[in-house]
Amino acid sequence: MEKVLSSHVGMKINEWYYHIQRFNVPDAEAYKEEIKSLLDDMEENQDLLLYFSLMEFRHKIMLDYLNPLENGKERANIRELAMKIKKDQEKLTGLLDFYFNFFYGMYEFENYEYLNAITFYKRAEKKLSLVSDDIERAEFNYKMAEIYYHMKQNHMSMHHIAQAIECYREKETYTVREIQCSFVIGSITT
């Protein structure tokens, strides 16, 4: 049987992430399953396997965000996956290092560990220049604004939310995120 090109799987992971960013659960689930089936037949590529693990982690964060479990419980394997990825962190470079720190910051934020979250976000910020996607940069700024808001650092929050909303306004498909940015601004100014 012929091996699946890792570049093909990488493109599929990018498409999966596109749907994760838009909170499009049905399509994200479909891509995840398709990619899992391709991984078994893929040529060996450790970086791509790490990328898959990071996106799987982000996928689970999305699901927890959309459907939080009661009393602070989390999905059984999200913590295990987080620990597995954290163990492999020293292998991450460049954009993968950005994603690790950004996603782990989200994870810590969702667990109300704000100081840990800001530490991971700051590490991600050092790699932000490697991110070419405007929406990804906007999402980073939105998350920074969100955490600074929770830490009562309104000037920093306003700085980041202004950058995020500017990008979201330019994209027709991000109206919901633009509205969420407006909520943050409204919360800061009242």
Spans of model-derived segments:
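Flexible inter-repeat linkers and adjacent short helices
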Residues: 1-104
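Alpha-solenoid helical repeat architecture
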Residues: 3-5, 44-49, 92-99, 132-139, ...
